[in-house]
Swiss-Prot record:
Known function: Core subunit of the mitochondrial membrane respiratory chain NADH dehydrogenase (Complex I) that is believed to belong to the minimal assembly required for catalysis. Complex I functions in the transfer of electrons from NADH to the respiratory chain. The immediate electron acceptor for the enzyme is believed to be ubiquinone.
Domain of life: Eukaryota
GO molecular function: NADH dehydrogenase (ubiquinone) activity
GO cellular component, one term: mitochondrial membrane
Family the entry assigns: Belongs to the complex I subunit 3 family.
UniProt entry keywords in alphabetical sequence: Electron transport, Membrane, Mitochondrion, NAD, Respiratory chain, Translocase, Transmembrane, Transmembrane helix, Transport, Ubiquinone
Chain segments annotated as transmembrane: 1-21, 55-75, 87-107
Catalyses which reaction(s): a ubiquinone + NADH + 5 H(+)(in) = a ubiquinol + NAD(+) + 4 H(+)(out)
Main localization, broad class: mitochondrion
Subcellular location: Mitochondrion membrane
InterPro entries associated with the record: NADH_UbQ/plastoQ_OxRdtase_su3 (IPR000440), NDAH_ubi_oxred_su3_sf (IPR038430)
Protein known as: NADH-ubiquinone oxidoreductase chain 3
E.C. numbers: 7.1.1.2
Length: 115
């Protein structure tokens, strides 16, 4: 009975959804759908503007350190358990590795904005 619910049923649902997608009408792109929308005005320039690679690198670093904070949030629940030292050691190692990565990026000039 468990096999039916855990293997066969998801397979049948997936097959059903694939069949529905096969028979739905396709969206055919044309010139109007692919053009940028500018509130009824004629486009003044290209919609694909280049951006600075420095901005891209800083954005990636921001995402990495934002994820660090998210991964450290469960530390509060880990400190409620009996093994405080294990949680603190793991969090410290995690922060030290990310700090070493930040120092490496700083020394390589990845945080310098001037071009």
């Amino acid at each position: 009975m468990i096999t039916l619910h855990m293997v066969v049923l998801p397979f049948l649902i997936t097959l059903f959804l694939l069949l529905i997608i096969k028979f739905l009408p396709m969206n055919v792109p044309d010139k109007e759908k692919l053009s940028p929308y500018e509130c009824g005005f004629d486009p003044s320039g290209s919609a694909r503007l280049p951006f600075s690679m420095k901005f891209f690198l800083v954005a990636i670093l921001f995402i990495l350190f934002d994820l660090e904070i998210i991964l450290l949030f469960p530390l509060a629940w880990a400190l409620n358990s009996q093994s405080h030292s294990n949680a603190i050691i793991l969090a410290s190692v995690f922060v030290i590795i990310l700090t070493l990565g930040l120092i490496y990026e700083w020394l390589k000039g990845g945080l310098e904005w001037t071009e």
